[in-house]
């Protein structure tokens, strides 16, 4: 697991950092022990995910909902909790946001290592229907200039 970016943070332990943290306003650093698992895993796919993490590191944040239930990244979670104590998660506040962040993670994984077309691809094809349902995510904490009068 040499490709994992991790360091020690006081009060958190060993933190595993994703490479691509696109929507920083939605990131939350959580200890693995504070995240609730709601879905099972499949041994074969877990091995595929483990091999990808060994090759590339952790590419994307996992996704939790407003109740800190893991909604995307179960296989990554199972692999990573043996490598550290905490990581960054996207915090989704609705089903639409869970779907969007989950699709974003798939897209990041597909585009890696060339992320130059990420924003363009988010608004194309099957990704567009997810992005259109959560336009507020793209403007959170963005300063909006007042129009000149």
Where are these regions (language model features)?
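Short, charged/polar connector segments at secondary-structure boundaries
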Residues: 1-92, 101-115, 123
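A broadly used, surface-exposed interaction patch
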Residues: 95-97
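Alpha-helical interaction elements
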Residues: 112-149
């Amino acid at each position: 697991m040499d490709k994992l970016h991790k360091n020690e943070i006081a009060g958190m332990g060993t933190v595993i950092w994703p490479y691509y943290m696109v929507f920083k306003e939605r990131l939350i650093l959580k200890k693995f022990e504070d995240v609730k698992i709601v879905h099972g895993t499949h041994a074969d796919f877990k091995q595929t995910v483990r091999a990808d993490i060994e090759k590339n590191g952790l590419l994307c944040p996992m996704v939790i909902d407003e109740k800190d239930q893991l909604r995307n990244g179960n296989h990554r979670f199972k692999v990573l909790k043996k490598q550290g104590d905490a990581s960054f998660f996207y915090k989704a506040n609705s089903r639409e946001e869970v779907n969007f962040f989950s699709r974003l993670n798939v897209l990041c994984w597909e585009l890696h290592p060339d992320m130059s077309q990420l924003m363009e691809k988010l608004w194309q094809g099957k990704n567009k229907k997810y992005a259109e349902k959560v336009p507020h995510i793209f403007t959170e904490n963005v300063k909006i200039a007042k129009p000149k009068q």
